[in-house]
């Protein structure tokens, strides 16, 4: 029998079962767990290759074939790290398995035909599009920045560069909700809006949900009192929508215990749960141990570095409309920035107590760095803490598959579950919207090669349009055809509440995008956070700010150097 070396095989068809590769310039190594393709029957497109008429391409009608096949891709997702062909049809993931022509090939689960386009996935990593669940919609240019980084869904609120939006992720009231949903039609991004949750009567909250909000945001700048928390969660329970909260840094209306009591065991998404982004000082971090709390971080504190503390003060003053000439404003800002809790946040992410990472875009966060900073945190923890249980440390140096699954879940499946959109997005699974990102391994997490929205390429790193081939410089990110015209409306989703969809807001507002209702937000709990469901008992020393979780002191050194940084951004 003819044989081929592993190296030659990997160069031709991509790595296979047992092969290992490094993610970007991090210390993270992954190993392929399974290969769904069949040796000797692999399909590949090109001159003299397999996907040709009567060979790997069948004669079947389009109804029996996929619209797109991504060949020999390496899928990295919360459920596995596997090699497979991926079939897309009707804007969704139709199959993960073996592509080809079933008339002449065995084991084919993805039929390729004359109506099939090919994307070469050999040597490429495929992930689900990222979900950023903490967006201040301050400027529409954020959307392009996020898309080009590999984010395909943005959840948050705002109305543009208004003072309220600088500080809070809120689209307040039915009028603004309608206008912002109309604006969402213009962008190749899945978008869900949060209304203002700060009210002590249910009426003003219900009308925002009925106008299209997928959830409500409680923010201390609007007054996050126990009464407002209770009212907001009552509306959420009645409408199957999520609540996100930025708690009371100054402890004016009560301490963290009062806030937890106001939750009454009901599900809630706690933003920047460490506290530098805002929340009960100094111990908001302890809520990550509650069964009903779904905790996330924002990316300025990801990971803890020698520069983290210095940059936060100025960010805070600007974002929260504070005056540096007022001593109380300075004290407010300084109370939120604690090296001890930021260091503990790194470890709580690594142990799976913090479940999500988001941006806090232009409001103490960088919209294009959710994915980068997630993997920088994973690298730092691997370097400082070694292998996680479940990741082997063998003669070959071991791999980090479990750690990688834990961290990829933080910006894909877990925010999807939290906000009731996991039936549509959040993972590379059959039936889901085909929001996929392709990466060269050396650029993983930093610079994607292709971004697909609803099964069509929406953005790509593309060379000079006047060149004779696609690759000559200048190569930079450019919008592609899924970002244009009517294709944009069919390749991206706008998420709304069930009440709004039933009320026919699509027709009433004149919306062109496909609308999808959120669901299941009130039954999700910490135990549902994939690979990130630890519920430790956390205490914070009020004088030293030292954090202890289940009796273990959580502390680590700040990073002085990180991967995925200047090496990739020289120009």
UniProtKB/Swiss-Prot annotation:
Post-translational modification note? Carboxylation allows a single lysine to coordinate two nickel ions.
For the ligand (Ni(2+) 1), the binding residues are: 134, 136, 217, 360
The Gene Ontology biological process terms listed for this entry are: urea catabolic process
- List its EC numbers: 3.5.1.5
Its quaternary structure?
Heterotrimer of UreA (gamma), UreB (beta) and UreC (alpha) subunits. Three heterotrimers associate to form the active enzyme.
> CDD domains, from UniProt?
Urease_alpha
Record GO terms (molecular function): nickel cation binding; urease activity
Q: Which SUPFAM superfamilies match?
A: Composite domain of metallo-dependent hydrolases, Metallo-dependent hydrolases
Which cell locations does it reside in? Cytoplasm
Residues recorded as bearing N6-carboxylysine in the entry = 217
Binding sites annotated in the UniProt record for Ni(2+) 2: 217, 246, 272
Q: What is the lineage of its organism?
A: Bacteria, Pseudomonadati, Pseudomonadota, Betaproteobacteria, Burkholderiales
Return the similarity comment: Belongs to the metallo-dependent hydrolases superfamily. Urease alpha subunit family.
Reaction equations catalysed: urea + 2 H2O + H(+) = hydrogencarbonate + 2 NH4(+)
Domain Urease: start-end pairs: 129-571
| Catalytic residues (positions) | 320 (proton donor)
Q: How is the cofactor bound?
A: Binds 2 nickel ions per subunit.
The UniProt transmembrane annotation reads: none
What UniProt keywords apply to this chain's record, in alphabetical order? Cytoplasm, Hydrolase, Metal-binding, Nickel
Segment forming the signal sequence: none
Quick one: which residues bind substrate? 219
Q: What is this protein called?
A: Urease subunit alpha
Pathway listed = Nitrogen metabolism; urea degradation; CO(2) and NH(3) from urea (urease route): step 1/1
């Amino acid at each position: 029998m003819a044989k081929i070396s592993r190296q030659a095989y990997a160069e031709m068809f991509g790595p296979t079962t047992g092969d290992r590769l490094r993610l970007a310039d991090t210390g993270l190594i992954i190993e392929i767990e399974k290969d769904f393709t069949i040796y000797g029957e692999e399909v590949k497109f090109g001159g003299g290759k397999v996907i040709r008429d009567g060979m790997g391409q069948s004669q079947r009608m389009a109804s029996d074939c996929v619209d797109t096949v991504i060949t020999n891709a390496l899928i990295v997702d919360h459920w596995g790290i596997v090699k497979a062909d991926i079939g897309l049809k009707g804007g969704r993931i139709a199959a993960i398995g073996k592509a080809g022509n079933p008339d002449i090939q065995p084991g084919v689960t993805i039929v390729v035909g004359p109506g099939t386009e090919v994307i070469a996935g050999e040597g490429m990593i495929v992930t689900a599009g990222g979900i950023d669940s903490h967006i201040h919609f301050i400027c529409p240019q954020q959307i392009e920045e996020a898309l080009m980084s590999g984010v395909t869904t943005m959840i948050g609120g705002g109305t543009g560069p208004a003072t309220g939006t600088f500080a809070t992720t809120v689209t307040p009231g039915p009028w603004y909700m309608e206008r912002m949903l109309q604006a969402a039609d213009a962008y190749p991004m899945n978008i869900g809006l949060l209304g203002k949750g700060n009210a002590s009567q249910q009426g003003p909250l219900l009308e925002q949900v009925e106008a299209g909000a997928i959830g409500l945001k409680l923010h201390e700048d609007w007054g996050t009192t126990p009464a407002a928390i209770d009212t907001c969660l009552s509306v959420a329970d009645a409408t199957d929508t999520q609540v996100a909260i930025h708690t009371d840094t100054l402890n004016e209306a009560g301490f963290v215990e009062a806030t937890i009591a106001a939750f009454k065991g009901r599900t809630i998404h706690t933003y920047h749960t460490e506290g530098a982004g805002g929340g009960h000082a100094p111990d908001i971090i302890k809520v990550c141990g509650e069964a009903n709390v779904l905790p996330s971080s924002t990316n300025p504190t990801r990971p803890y570095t020698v520069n983290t503390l210095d940059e936060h003060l100025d960010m805070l003053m600007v974002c929260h409309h504070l005056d540096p000439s007022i001593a109380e404003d300075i004290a407010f800002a300084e109370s939120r920035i604690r090296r001890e809790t930021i260091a503990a946040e790194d470890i709580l992410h690594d142990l799976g107590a913090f479940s999500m990472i988001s941006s806090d875009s232009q409001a103490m966060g960088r919209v294009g760095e959710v994915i980068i900073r997630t993997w920088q945190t994973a690298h730092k923890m691997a370097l400082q803490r070694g292998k996680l249980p479940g990741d082997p440390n063998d003669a070959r140096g071991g791999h980090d598959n479990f750690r990688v699954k834990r961290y990829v879940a933080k910006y894909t499946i877990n925010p999807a579950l939290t906000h009731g959109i996991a039936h549509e997005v959040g993972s590379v699974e059959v039936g889901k919207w085909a929001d996929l990102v392709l990466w060269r391994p050396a650029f993983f997490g930093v610079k994607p090669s292709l971004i697909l929205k609803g099964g069509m390429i929406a953005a790509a790193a593309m060379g000079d349009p006047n060149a004779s081939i696609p690759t000559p410089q200048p190569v930079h990110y450019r919008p592609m055809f899924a970002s244009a015209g009517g294709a944009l409306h069919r390749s991206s989703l706008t998420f709304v509440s069930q009440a709004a969809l039933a009320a026919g807001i699509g027709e009433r507002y004149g919306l062109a995008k496909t609308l999808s209702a959120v669901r299941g937000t009130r039954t999700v709990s910490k135990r549902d956070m994939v690979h990130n469901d630890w519920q430790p008992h956390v205490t914070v020393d009020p004088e030293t700010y030292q954090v202890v979780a289940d009796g273990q002191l959580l502390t680590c050194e700040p990073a002085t150097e990180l991967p995925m940084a200047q090496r990739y951004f020289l120009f």
